[in-house]
Amino acid sequence: MDTRRILEHPVLAPVLSVTFNHDNSCFAVGLDHGFRIYESGSCVLRTSRDFGAGIGMVQMLGRTNILGLVGGGRQTKLSRNKLVLWDDKSKKQVGVISASSLVRGAKMSSKRIVLVLMDRVQVYQTAKPHPLLSTYETTDNPLGLCCLSSDRIAFPGRAIGHVQLVEVETGNVSIITAHTSALRAMALSQDGELLATASEMGTIIRVYATSNCARLYELRRGIDKAIIFSIGFSPSGKYLACTSDKSTLHVFDVTRPGGTRPITSNGGTAYAAGEPSVTGNNRPSSPYSVASSSGGGGGVMVNSNNGGSDMAADDGQGRWGFLSKLPLMPRIFSDPYSFASAKFEMADEPVSNGSREPLTRDGGLAIIGGPLKGNLGWISETEMVVIGAGRDPKWEKFAIQEGGQQDGYQGGGRRLVRVGWKRYGGETP
């Protein structure tokens, strides 16, 4: 009888959350004993701090030494109702912002600090003494959804599926009726000119011009319902990518030549200093070109071994070919699909007895700072990383490549290729 012990992957203390800095060049993870910061492009450990207690979320202020910390884990180091400003160079607390309830998320820039609570968003001045500038009520926001660019803040509205878009300097608020079901993910482009949203349905991603709230695109991830983990724009806003619980990374074209008008021109309503005002054509137009609803992606599907609908890609003529041109056909035949897709790893979580427990559909362990798996960040115009948290944390790097051969495909189209993989978290500081 073979009595040799089966080798099992060691169960590590879980990574509680994953967050990127402003340009995705670094990512930070909260741990049961402290936090770590890595270079996104290489997954090389940059900073490690062991407090002997849990940090639920780490938010970076660019590439500076200032971090925002929120307590978490089995034995928390800090209160979950406070954002502690930590100077990692001097290794000491330099400020604290208290909230009336659990902090669900936080964003930081050189001008503003944004705290996300369950039913409101609070905006503070970054400069000391960090005065509270404004408070915005929201619908319940357990995921802590919020986006911050240099001049705009986006977060859920007071009604399900709505988005509030705030101009940092003026305080003007625009309301975008994005979806009929609750928001699941959102992202601003780096220049703040584009906003992408996804709902709990997970089939459609909508893209808006923030200058006039016009809806520019409706991008179809797939036909089946899915949970969108993360969405993000490439640095120039040319591409948009998303991850979902289908364990698939999709990449879409956003700016296509030949577009002449948006799908709709009345995607939102603006309010100046709390008073209703007319927007629409009075607001400046977006510098981005817009697409019709019948566009093709000019690419190919890769990693197509499963044949599932979630791996479908646009071949330049539309996924459905001539059917997309027929009148009165359902929208699924004419919606733009991703031009390339690839699988990322979303394994079950190992537990202490050696068995494995499946991930929950909402992303698992992480309460703040993002989902357990599928945290997406663009690191260049053609490269992105997908980072998982939990007890088996992984880093994966993908690249858009032109032409070549993969999975039986050979030609001049685009494909999405995994070019790096690493299990992180066990490094010696």
From Swiss-Prot:
Entry's Gene Ontology cellular component terms: cytoplasmic vesicle membrane; cytosol; phagophore assembly site membrane; vacuolar membrane
Top-level taxon of the source organism: Eukaryota
Pfam families: PROPPIN (PF21032)
Annotated region described as Disordered, given as residue ranges: 262-297
SMART domains: WD40 (SM00320)
Protein task: Involved in mitochondrial or peroxisomal functions and amino acid signaling pathways.
One Gene Ontology term of the molecular function aspect: protein-macromolecule adaptor activity
WD repeats: 10-48, 50-96, 178-218, 223-262
Species whose genome carries this gene: Neurospora crassa (strain ATCC 24698 / 74-OR23-1A / CBS 708.71 / DSM 1257 / FGSC 987)
Places the protein is found: Vacuole membrane; Cytoplasmic vesicle membrane
Protein family per UniProt: Belongs to the WD repeat PROPPIN family.
GO biological process entries: autophagy of mitochondrion; glycophagy; nucleophagy; pexophagy; protein localization to phagophore assembly site; protein transport
Record protein name field: SVP1-like protein 2
Keywords: Cytoplasmic vesicle, Membrane, Protein transport, Repeat, Transport, Vacuole, WD repeat
Note on domains (UniProt): May contain a beta-propeller domain involved in specific binding to phosphatidylinositol 3,5-bisphosphate (PIP2), leading to the association of the protein to the membrane.
Membrane topology: Peripheral membrane protein
